[in-house]
Structures are given as C-alpha cells and as structure tokens.
Regions:
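Residue-level recognition of the N-termini of beta-strands and the immediately preceding loop/turn
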Residues: 4, 48-50, 74-76, 148-150
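N-terminal glycine-rich phosphate-binding loop and ensuing alpha1 helix
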Residues: 2-67
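Conserved beta-loop-beta/alpha segment of the NTase-like Rossmann-fold superfamily
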Residues: 75, 81-160
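Short loop/turn motifs at secondary-structure junctions
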Residues: 20, 46, 72, 113-116
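Acidic donor-binding segment of Leloir-type glycosyltransferases
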Residues: 60-78, 84-85
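Glycine-rich, phosphate-binding/catalytic loops in enzymes
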Residues: 23-27, 70, 134-138
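Short, well-ordered coil/turn elements that cap or connect secondary structure elements
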Residues: 1, 71-73, 145
Length: 160
C-alpha cells in the first residue's frame, strides 16, 4: 500500500479558548478529542502515517493525550513549529509571539513528509468523505481553496 500522510496542524495558541489546550480538550462521550475522529476517518480511508505539527511546549501533554496512543496503530512523527524557523531571507519581526500560520506550519514538516499528504486543523471536524476522496481520486493532487477579493468582504469564490 502506498504511504499517505495526514498532517495535523496543532500548534495554535487558542487565545480565545481560555484555560487548557484547545486541541486536546475532550469532546466525545469517552473523552475523545476532535483529532481522534479525524485520525480514525483518515486511517479508515487508507492513510497510514500521521504527522503532528505542534509547539515544543505542548509535546509532553500532546503525547500523553493522543500521540502515544496513535503511535500504537500507525506511524507517527512530530514537527515543531518555531517562530524563528523561516526561509532564508526572512526574519521574525520584533515582538512577534504568535505562530505564523498554515504556510509556516507545513514548512515545519518539510524533512518528515516525502509522500502524498493532506493537511488539516487539529480542532476542526471534517468527516470521512474528504479523506476517502484523497485516497481514491486519480488526480495527482487535490486542493480546496477560498479566494476572497479582500479579507473584509463576505463575497468569496469557492473552488472545490
């Protein structure tokens, strides 16, 4: 079976969430977190590797809540999103404390992911269909995007 990785962005701060780590907060009847559902759906669809993008300060809690358990059923790797891990020619602005976002998060796993992959947010639920579509389509790549004329306009063009 060809290797397909699920890359999970879980380094966010969750500043509006309050106490605790939003990505690790139980939501299911048996203490499941949202990632449990996404990982289950992805593995059922044929994914066979999980890469967690996290902050170094979350590593211990992250492994205790989900990482160690998932590593018993599939290959698991960790990438660490660091504020200073930027492409050549770029520098962190003075005073910046928040993660850069999606692009820099995915860049953090550049040495770990050599196979086709899908990127998801740790705290969003996707359902099984997107993962099935990724593993069964004949396309060489898939992308979902939303193009907005400007960040403050509600009128966006959606491309499936």
């Amino acid at each position: 079976m060809k290797k397909t990785a699920l890359v999970i962005m879980a380094a966010g701060i969750g500043s509006r969430f309050g106490k605790g780590i939003k990505q690790l907060e139980p939501v299911g009847p048996n203490g499941e977190i949202i990632m449990d559902y996404s990982i289950h759906d992805a593995l059922e669809a044929g994914f066979n590797k999980v890469v967690f993008i996290i902050r170094k300060d979350l590593e211990k809690d992250f492994k205790e809540v989900i990482g160690n358990r998932i590593s018993k059923i599939t290959e698991v790797e960790y990438a660490f999103q660091e504020l200073d891990d930027l492409p050549a020619g770029f520098a962190k602005p003075e005073g910046r404390t928040k993660p850069w976002g999606t692009g820099q998060a995915v860049l953090a796993c550049k040495g770990l992911v050599k196979e086709p992959f899908a990127v998801i947010n740790a705290d969003d639920y996707y359902g099984k269909d997107p993962f099935v579509n990724c593993t069964t389509t004949s396309y060489r790549s898939m992308m979902w995007m939303k193009l907005c004329r400007s960040p403050w306009q509600d009128s966006c063009l959606e491309t499936p």
